[in-house]
Amino acid sequence: MAVRSKSSKAWLHEHINDHYVHMAQKDGYRARAAYKLLEINEKDKIIKPGTVLADLGSAPGSWSQVAAKLTGTSGTVFALDILPMEAIGGVSFIQGDFRENDVLAQFETLLDNRPLDLVICDMAPNMSGNAVSDQARSFYLCELALDFASQHLKTGGSFLVKVFQGAGYQEYMAAMREIFGTVQTRKPEASRNRSSEIYLLGKNKR
């Protein structure tokens, strides 16, 4: 039997006693991350009926669940992830790497020449435990997401992305400011206090 580290025991204790974990189970969301998007949307109204959006790194699907609920039948939600994701009503899911041409071709066929109103991205790399390496890999994913957003968003569109404060943060913020009229930071209550994660919201794509 494997012996758990102190850090993994602490995480498990925190998870079991987490208010948002219990809420997610009660409300039918696949992960507590749903409440981060709900809180941001309550403030910024980036998702509303009729919104056309893409959810990058969507699995297990809590953000796509929220998006489908908020866009309603008049909106469109595309979800992309390398990992499998169980079907969600109102969500068109593509399993694959959005950097690859065949995956982009599938997405663009579904998009049918419509520009996106919004791109959302709650991706994070598999953590190795090496802080420097993990931070670099995290921002690499963020850069890929920003490139995707810059190519597919309509003029005036928005981009919401999770980043981790540290090396590369200021440079990434500057890159977003070149593409969007405004860039704001958001730290939802559902984000754990000990986490360095923060969300950047770019609005009014140039």
UniProtKB/Swiss-Prot annotation:
Pfam families: FtsJ. It catalyses: uridine(2552) in 23S rRNA + S-adenosyl-L-methionine = 2'-O-methyluridine(2552) in 23S rRNA + S-adenosyl-L-homocysteine + H(+). GO terms for molecular function: rRNA (uridine-2'-O-)-methyltransferase activity. This is Ribosomal RNA large subunit methyltransferase E. Its main location: cytoplasm. GO terms for cellular component: cytoplasm. The active site is at residue 162. It comes from Neisseria gonorrhoeae (strain NCCP11945). InterPro entries: RNA_methyltr_RlmE, RNA_MeTrfase_FtsJ_dom, rRNA-MeTfrase_E, SAM-dependent_MTases_sf. S-adenosyl-L-methionine binds at residues 61, 63, 81, 97, 122. Specifically methylates the uridine in position 2552 of 23S rRNA at the 2'-O position of the ribose in the fully assembled 50S ribosomal subunit. HAMAP family: RNA_methyltr_E (MF_01547). Keywords: Cytoplasm, Methyltransferase, rRNA processing, S-adenosyl-L-methionine, Transferase. It is found in: Cytoplasm. It is an enzyme of class 2 (transferase). Its EC number is 2.1.1.166. Belongs to the class I-like SAM-binding methyltransferase superfamily. RNA methyltransferase RlmE family.
